[in-house]
């Protein structure tokens, strides 16, 4: 299946997708036990309504996109949101060229289609165009994502032991940090 181009979330225009953002976030936590801000169980008023905590999180991210503190990239498959990633900007005079890669999440239904790679390529393209040349990110040690980032040219910086609480079994897990200098590509 041919994928449409990655698009940038536009506040107002794409607000109708907030529930889909939240449901993908929940799916990734429940399916892969992704260390991504929240723990299950997720509570739904009805099947079409995501957990209020997760929905509010994405509404806050949409507000940050409106304030140009974040750029959110989306991959659609037809009319459905399949995955997303955010580029966070640094609000400091000593590092205006730094950015953070946040919440690269692809719905389990749309995996193995190259969506993560496409999202990251678009994020890097836009980052460069904005003068954001040094990207950093983190992910759980041993997660599938840990293997993706080196293939995309990210350098493993190191790990912090017992960094986060696993949504699977509440044990403490390590977090791995990566960076990529876009000036060198």
Where are each of the predicted segments found?
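Helix-turn-helix
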Residues: 145
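Conserved catalytic-core motifs of GNAT/GCN5-like acyltransferases
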Residues: 136-140, 150, 155-172
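Acetyl-CoA-dependent GNAT
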Residues: 7-12, 16-103, 107, 120, ...
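Conserved GNAT acetyl-CoA-binding A-motif
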Residues: 120, 127-140
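Conserved acetyl-CoA pyrophosphate-binding loop and the N-cap/start of the following alpha-helix
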Residues: 110, 114-122
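A short, internal acetyl-CoA/4′-phosphopantetheine-binding micro-motif in the GNAT/acyltransferase core
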Residues: 104-111, 140
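Terminal substrate-recognition subdomain of acyl/acetyltransferases
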Residues: 2-4, 10-11, 155, 167-185
């Amino acid at each position: 299946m041919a994928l449409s181009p990655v698009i940038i979330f536009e506040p107002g225009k794409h607000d109708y997708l907030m529930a889909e953002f939240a449901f993908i976030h929940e799916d990734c936590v429940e399916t892969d036990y992704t260390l991504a801000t929240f723990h299950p169980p997720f509570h739904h008023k009805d099947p079409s309504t995501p957990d209020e905590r997760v929905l509010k999180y994405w509404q806050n991210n949409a507000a940050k996109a409106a304030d140009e503190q974040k750029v959110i990239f989306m991959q659609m498959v037809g009319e459905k949101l399949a995955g997303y990633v955010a580029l966070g900007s640094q609000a400091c005079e000593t590092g205006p060229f730094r950015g953070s890669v946040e919440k690269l999440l692809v719905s389990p239904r749309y995996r193995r289609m190259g969506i993560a790679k496409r999202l990251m390529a678009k994020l890097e393209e836009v980052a460069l165009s904005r003068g954001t040349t040094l990207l950093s990110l983190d992910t759980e040690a041993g997660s599938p994502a840990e293997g993706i980032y080196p293939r995309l040219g990210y350098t493993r910086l190191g790990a912090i032991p017992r960094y986060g609480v696993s949504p699977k079994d509440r044990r403490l897990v390590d977090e791995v940090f990566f960076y990529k200098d876009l000036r060198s590509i």
